[in-house]
């Protein structure tokens, strides 16, 4: 074995260090060292010839890997292997900073399971009856938030394990957007001077603009929670407060969320510096909330209205609204603010039902106005000219009225959403999310929605601490139990629609309660109060007007309009009456 190794080494010097010969040399040297170690360990006391061979091997030792390959290598990989394979003890982190193999395997298996659910569309049977990829990604983002960040009942830093899991998992889900591109024309110059127009790929404009902004908002919210590591306030479970209080049964009423923790402040209240910091953090969170709501409203507005939603609409606006709302919207003295003041909006169901009715009436009126105009154009040209003018004038007047009514309903819906920013998604929004096929828009909508929920929760928690500080300073020497009872009482009044302080206007959000048939993913249902909230949203974008970020309704699409084909004098008259 010794001679073979020396011959091999000299041969490698003679014929050059090619890759194949180097690999063969390394294998032969490794085998020779292994065989020599095994033979020396099996024999007891070696002979003189054995000692001389060992001495010769020590003099002419084989070259190291670093000498052969030309770069430094670790010493651990060149050591002689013993006869018995030593089982490595699993360590959490080795000397090189790598995690143990078991942890990597579990993470890989988790990613495999998540990608399998996305590809199968949440249909584990594999029969192809799952949801579309857009809805599957939206469901995955929503469920990930609910599992990791959905229970923010305290102002405290997020555990490092949850933080790493959130960032790793959300990056995996958002990585799909890296492959969503759009083709743009560009010119390519050749050496001979010719210029040819080619199509280049670039990231889609909405993802390129909004997704980095959402990532930045995500990091800001996590940094806000990390800033509450050392605070002057603390939290106490309501069960402990009830056991210590002599009036333990005074607040145990139906609907009281006794399982939620209550904030506590010192008897003399928070310091001025802490108070200013909380006020600044509240305003900063408010701006983040507005940005998330704006991106979410734009993403929803750009989604197409499902045909199933349009087919389920009633035939006229009175059937959608009811007699009371219909009379107020169609009256000459219409005022959205006065109408909202005259309606009982003390319950969440009443507000959601009103929003659904008003939103449906918008589409009914606009669809009827457009359909009447097309019917008048599709009639035969053999009709007398006078009848054509009369019908066109009559339908033009009816269409203008319906368009005015639709604009009034839209303004009423905007005022309603501004008054209740935590309003749950309407039937149209839910239908858009369910039937949306655009993966990019689905990512923007779901990511902005969960960040909006997180910002809202942080704002509510800050308001709770500030409210407890106000109570402690007003009461002076009042005990903590009375402060806790007041906070519970005002929280219950806020949930039932009471009015008063800022804490009443922001009730704890209940994020996920609506689900679709065929999928297990819930959707946002933020709670609200009937009073005007402190978080006023950005101006909402109408899904009908077009404008910036808006889309045309399906019944206004160009493929359904035949007037482009030309109707002679009838088309000229229609264009004149429009202008």
UniProtKB/Swiss-Prot annotation:
Sequence ranges assigned to domain PRONE in this UniProt record = 98-479
Chain segments carrying region Disordered: 31-89
Q: Report keywords, A-Z.
A: Guanine-nucleotide releasing factor
Q: Which GO terms describe its molecular function?
A: guanyl-nucleotide exchange factor activity
Q: Does the keyword Coiled coil apply?
A: no
What PROSITE patterns does the entry give?
A: PRONE
Gene3D superfamilies linked to this entry: PRONE domain, subdomain 1 (1.20.58.2010)
Respond yes or no to whether keyword Repeat is given for this record. no
Compositional bias (Low complexity) at which positions? Answer: 31-61
What the record says about its domains? The PRONE (plant-specific Rop nucleotide exchanger) domain is responsible for the GEF activity.
PANTHER family assigned to the protein according to its UniProt record, in alphabetical order: ROP GUANINE NUCLEOTIDE EXCHANGE FACTOR 1, ROP GUANINE NUCLEOTIDE EXCHANGE FACTOR 6
Function per UniProt: Guanine-nucleotide exchange factor (GEF) that acts as an activator of Rop (Rho of plants) GTPases by promoting the exchange of GDP for GTP.
Name-wise, this protein is: Rop guanine nucleotide exchange factor 6
Gene that produces this protein:
ROPGEF6
């Amino acid at each position: 074995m010794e001679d073979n190794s020396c011959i091999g080494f000299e041969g490698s010097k003679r014929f050059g260090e090619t890759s194949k010969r180097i690999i063969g040399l390394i294998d032969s040297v490794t085998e020779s060292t292994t065989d020599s170690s095994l033979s020396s360990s099996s024999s007891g006391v070696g002979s003189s010839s054995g000692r001389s061979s060992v001495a010769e091997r020590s003099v002419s030792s084989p070259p190291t890997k670093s000498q052969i390959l030309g770069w430094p290598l670790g010493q651990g990989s060149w050591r002689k292997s013993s006869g018995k394979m030593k089982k490595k003890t699993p360590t959490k982190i080795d000397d090189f900073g790598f995690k143990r193999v078991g942890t990597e395997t579990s993470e890989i298996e988790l990613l495999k399971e998540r990608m399998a659910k996305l590809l199968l569309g949440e249909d584990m049977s594999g029969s192809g009856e799952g949801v579309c990829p857009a809805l599957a990604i939206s469901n995955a983002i929503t469920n990930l938030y609910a599992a990791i960040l959905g229970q923010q009942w305290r102002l405290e830093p997020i555990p490092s394990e949850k933080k790493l899991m959130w960032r790793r998992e959300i990056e995996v889900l958002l990585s799909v957007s890296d492959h969503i591109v759009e083709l743009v024309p560009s010119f390519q110059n050749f050496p001979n001077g010719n210029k040819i127009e080619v199509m280049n790929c670039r990231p889609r404009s909405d993802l390129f603009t909004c997704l980095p902004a959402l990532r930045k908002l995500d990091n800001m919210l996590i940094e806000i929670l990390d800033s509450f590591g050392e605070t002057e306030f603390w939290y106490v479970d309501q069960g402990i407060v009830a056991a210590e209080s002599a009036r333990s049964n005074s607040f145990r009423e139906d609907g009281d969320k006794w399982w939620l923790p209550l904030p506590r402040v010192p008897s003399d209240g928070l310091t001025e510096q802490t108070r200013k910091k909380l006020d600044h953090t509240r305003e900063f969170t408010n701006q983040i909330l507005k940005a998330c709501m704006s991106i979410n409203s734009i993403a929803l507005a750009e989604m197409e209205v499902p045909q199933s939603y349009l087919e389920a609409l009633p035939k006229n606006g009175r059937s959608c609204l009811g007699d009371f709302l219909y009379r107020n919207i169609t009256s000459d003295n219409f005022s959205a603010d006065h109408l909202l003041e005259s309606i009982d909006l003390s319950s969440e169901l009443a507000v959601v039902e009103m929003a659904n009715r008003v939103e449906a009436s918008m589409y009914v009126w606009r669809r009827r106005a457009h359909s009447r105009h097309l019917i008048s154009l599709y009639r035969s040209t053999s009709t007398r000219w006078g009848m054509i003018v009369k019908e066109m004038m009559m339908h033009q007047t009816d269409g203008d009225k319906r368009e005015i009514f639709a604009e009034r309903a839209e303004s009423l819906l905007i005022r309603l959403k501004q008054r209740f920013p935590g309003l749950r998604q309407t039937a149209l929004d839910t239908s858009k999310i369910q039937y949306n096929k655009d993966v990019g828009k689905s990512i923007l909508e779901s990511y902005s929605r969960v960040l909006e929920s997180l910002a809202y929760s942080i704002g509510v928690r800050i308001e709770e601490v500030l409210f407890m500080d106000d109570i402690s300073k007003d009461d002076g020497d009042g005990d903590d139990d009375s402060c806790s009872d007041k906070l519970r009482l005002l929280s219950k009044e806020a949930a039932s629609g009471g009015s008063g302080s800022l804490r009443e206007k922001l009730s704890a959000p209940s994020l996920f309660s609506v689900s679709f048939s065929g999928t297990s993913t819930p959707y946002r249902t933020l709670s609200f109060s009937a009073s005007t909230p402190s978080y006023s949203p950005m101006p909402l974008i109408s899904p009908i007007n077009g404008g910036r970020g808006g889309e045309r309704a399906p019944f206004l699409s160009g493929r359904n309009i035949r007037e482009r084909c030309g109707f002679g004098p009838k088309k000229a008259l229609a264009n004149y009456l429009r202008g």
